[in-house]
């Protein structure tokens, strides 16, 4: 009888709660205001031939490479960062080898590593979600072939110091080291300039968050040109759809829109953290477009916020996140709605007298 591989049969499930998302969607770290108007205008003028033809990725890759200041052979557009993670697993992981992650973190690192037949080594974050650089290095072995680090991290919003990331890349020359910068725009610091020093270093970016193109599924993976040549062998030449390729240059061309949105999100993040601190709710200072907070009765909190038209994400099942919710930030008008509903919910549930932040 036909049966999937053992690695596939034992994979954990990842079922994001997409159904019934009615309300202000602050649960998936999306751009809550939407993409640039220039993208919408481009969509209106798509020609039938563009949809009838196989997509051509290279001209758009050249534009993205120019914007990032890298050479085109160092860059690959992907079907979201998810595909970038999958491609690295397929390129570098053999069954029985090891992939290293820091937990809590993005669930798909573990799933793609396990699908490749690898053993996943989970290194717990330090107290207050401090990045455990020493502990990561201590878990590097001759079997280590992939290390995946979200920076800023999801769901905590915390960051890894560049010196730790450099030390990890230096300590694991036979492993691919992925620094996933999905929330780069809200943080502003990158490891992109380090790629020439470390040929085993890869940087991923997405256009789902700040750029508001989550529905088009487009991201980018950057690394050493020789290594990227191997990654391209695993990738389909038609992995990014024609609509995404047509719209991305317009999104990139409207940096004023991105800058305004990012500035408002950062402002909203400060406002949320101030309200949480005033209510003595523990939270993790964030460098992303979300904040993780420990509210205790997370499921009740999520339901009460939903009743007030605000969707937030229960992260209680993540390592060390018992009783926690993750709240996405948007522009000022969305922060106003969020904070009003938040205070009402805290008062109603009687959880505004929790422990101090630290």
Located regions from the model:
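Conserved PLP-anchoring active-site segment centered on the Schiff-base-forming lysine
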Residues: 91-112
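A short helix-loop-beta submotif of the ANL/AMP-binding
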Residues: 115-120
